[in-house]
Swiss-Prot record:
Homodimer. This is Pheromone-binding protein Gp-9. Residues 1-19 form the signal peptide. Keywords: Behavior, Disulfide bond, Pheromone response, Pheromone-binding, Secreted, Signal, Transport. Belongs to the PBP/GOBP family. Pfam families: PBP_GOBP. Colony queen number, a major feature of social organization, is associated with worker genotype for Gp-9. Colonies are headed by either a single reproductive queen (monogyne form) or multiple queens (polygyne form). Differences in worker Gp-9 genotypes between social forms may cause differences in workers' abilities to recognize queens and regulate their numbers. InterPro entries: PBP/GOBP, PBP_GOBP_sf, Pheromone-bd_protein_Gp-9. GO terms for molecular function: pheromone binding.
Amino acid sequence: MKTFVLHIFIFALVAFASASRDSAKKIGSQYDNYATCLTEHSLTEDDIFSIGEVSSGQHKTNHEDTELHKNGCVMQCLLEKDGLMSGADYDEEKMREDYIKETGAQPGDQRIEALNACMHETKDMEDKCDKSLLLVACVLAAEAVLADSNEGA
């Protein structure tokens, strides 16, 4: 019994450490063109918001508008280089396909519904950088809410 409890404790600790590590990662850092987009916008990794900061909405209150815009330009660069965006326009179908591939979400999954809602919410924005950051922030916030609701279930 003690061994079983120890295994559960270790599993919980690893899960917590993994979630903490993910929230400390920088938005977009998992993508191939991350370094290229940072260079194109004369930014360093220190200039980019963390996933935790964006998913909680803290990026909006802790940073100046210029920092928000610059982070958005890096996100737009990543989306454009992956063929998900051209200028300020999304390729919604490709965005859904890539999201499903990346997350393993299945049709009817609430995460896909959240992505659709986030794309709809931001589709009429004209500034490509602000639009990109708002889209990413919307999706990350929705994923955090869904993860919290699934933990409580």
